């Protein structure tokens, strides 16, 4: 009996060692990709903590030659960014833009996704194909035509105009992602609710929305990060004036007309990350589930 147990233990140890060596190349590849992906952010963060003269004379990696030398680190860049004129107002403008530009497309995309998944109407599949095709249309091709329309309607330079623009640009992805998820919900559950006399509105509010929270949260993260980090759309439709300028425009203005204060961008980039990181970590538990379900299920 003892010999059999010892033999089994040796077999298990051998199997574990074999499995370890088989998976070692995969682990090395994953760690290498993670290192390469993280390296630019690490360099940006270290640069944000260095004086301008050091950034001009030496590379950021030189801090590792004397890692315990505290005097080589400098917080003045963050102070300069926070004390710059209009930064507080820019944060409020970014929130004013990002929150409605996230909530509005979520509401519209969820309704549309339910209609594509569970309602029958003429041309449903063709219309959904057209929505998917919009995913590959570059938004840059729409900037000038839409801006001309905005100028005629008086929407240029207003928050409403940029809300509508971000809603239009985000809807194709939202509808595609949510339709795949909602369409994979149990058919028996939807049919049972319909047999009990529930209307489409009641099914949508009582069943679809609660069950689709992972996908909705995933799209919310994508949309919020896109809107918060956007510079081009805000610059075109808002014009860059101080009273409506978001953080991205304010950071670009910090550099100066000739780029002489470029070093402030390192600190400004990390300051602007605070709100998106809070949103991401707040919805993180839904994020992976929503992405996997929306892309794998059919």
Curated annotation (Swiss-Prot):
<feature type="transmembrane region" description="Helical">
    <location>
        <begin position="126"/>
        <end position="146"/>
    </location>
</feature>
<keyword id="KW-0813">Transport</keyword>
<protein>
    <recommendedName>
        <fullName>Osmoprotective compounds uptake permease protein GgtD</fullName>
    </recommendedName>
</protein>
<feature type="transmembrane region" description="Helical">
    <location>
        <begin position="263"/>
        <end position="283"/>
    </location>
</feature>
<dbReference type="GO" id="GO:0055085">
    <property type="term" value="P:transmembrane transport"/>
</dbReference>
<feature type="domain" description="ABC transmembrane type-1">
    <location>
        <begin position="91"/>
        <end position="283"/>
    </location>
</feature>
<dbReference type="InterPro" id="IPR035906">
    <property type="entry name" value="MetI-like_sf"/>
</dbReference>
<feature type="transmembrane region" description="Helical">
    <location>
        <begin position="158"/>
        <end position="178"/>
    </location>
</feature>
<feature type="transmembrane region" description="Helical">
    <location>
        <begin position="97"/>
        <end position="117"/>
    </location>
</feature>
<dbReference type="GO" id="GO:0005886">
    <property type="term" value="C:plasma membrane"/>
</dbReference>
<feature type="transmembrane region" description="Helical">
    <location>
        <begin position="231"/>
        <end position="251"/>
    </location>
</feature>
<comment type="subunit">
    <text>The complex is composed of two ATP-binding proteins (GgtA), two transmembrane proteins (GgtC and GgtD) and a solute-binding protein (GgtB).</text>
</comment>
<keyword id="KW-0812">Transmembrane</keyword>
<dbReference type="Pfam" id="PF00528">
    <property type="entry name" value="BPD_transp_1"/>
</dbReference>
<keyword id="KW-0472">Membrane</keyword>
<keyword id="KW-1003">Cell membrane</keyword>
<comment type="function">
    <text>Part of the ABC transporter complex GgtABCD involved in the uptake of the osmoprotective compounds glucosylglycerol (GG), sucrose and trehalose. Responsible for the translocation of the substrate across the membrane.</text>
</comment>
<feature type="transmembrane region" description="Helical">
    <location>
        <begin position="207"/>
        <end position="227"/>
    </location>
</feature>
<keyword id="KW-0762">Sugar transport</keyword>
<comment type="similarity">
    <text>Belongs to the binding-protein-dependent transport system permease family.</text>
</comment>
<dbReference type="InterPro" id="IPR000515">
    <property type="entry name" value="MetI-like"/>
</dbReference>
<keyword id="KW-1133">Transmembrane helix</keyword>
<feature type="transmembrane region" description="Helical">
    <location>
        <begin position="26"/>
        <end position="46"/>
    </location>
</feature>
């Amino acid at each position: 009996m003892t010999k059999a147990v010892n033999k089994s233990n040796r077999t298990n140890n051998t199997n574990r060692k074999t499995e370890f060596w088989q998976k070692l190349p995969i682990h090395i590849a994953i760690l290498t990709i993670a290192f390469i992906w993280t390296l630019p952010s690490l360099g940006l963060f270290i640069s944000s903590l260095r004086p301008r003269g050091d950034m001009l004379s030496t590379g950021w990696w030189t801090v590792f030659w004397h890692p315990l030398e505290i005097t080589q680190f400098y917080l003045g860049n963050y102070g300069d960014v926070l004390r710059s004129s209009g930064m507080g107002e820019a944060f409020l403008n970014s929130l004013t833009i990002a929150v409605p530009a996230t909530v509005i497309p979520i509401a519209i995309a969820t309704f549309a996704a339910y209609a594509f998944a569970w309602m029958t109407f003429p041309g449903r599949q063709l219309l959904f194909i057209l929505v998917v095709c919009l995913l590959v249309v570059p938004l840059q091709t729409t900037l000038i035509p839409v801006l001309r329309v905005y100028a005629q309607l008086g929407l240029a330079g207003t928050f409403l105009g940029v809300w509508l623009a971000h809603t239009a640009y985000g809807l194709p992805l939202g509808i595609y992602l949510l339709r795949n998820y909602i369409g994979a919900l149990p058919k028996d559950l939807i049919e049972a609710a319909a047999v009990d006399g529930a209307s489409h509105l009641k099914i949508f509010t009582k069943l679809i929305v609660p069950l689709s929270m992972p996908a909705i949260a995933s799209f919310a993260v994508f949309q919020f990060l896109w809107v918060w980090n956007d510079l081009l759309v805000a610059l075109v439709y808002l014009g860059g004036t101080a009273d409506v300028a978001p953080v991205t425009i304010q950071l670009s203005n910090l550099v100066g007309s000739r780029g002489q204060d470029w070093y402030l961008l390192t600190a400004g980039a990390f300051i602007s990350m605070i709100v998106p990181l809070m949103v991401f970590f707040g919805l993180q538990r839904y994020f992976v589930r929503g992405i996997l379900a929306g892309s794998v299920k059919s």
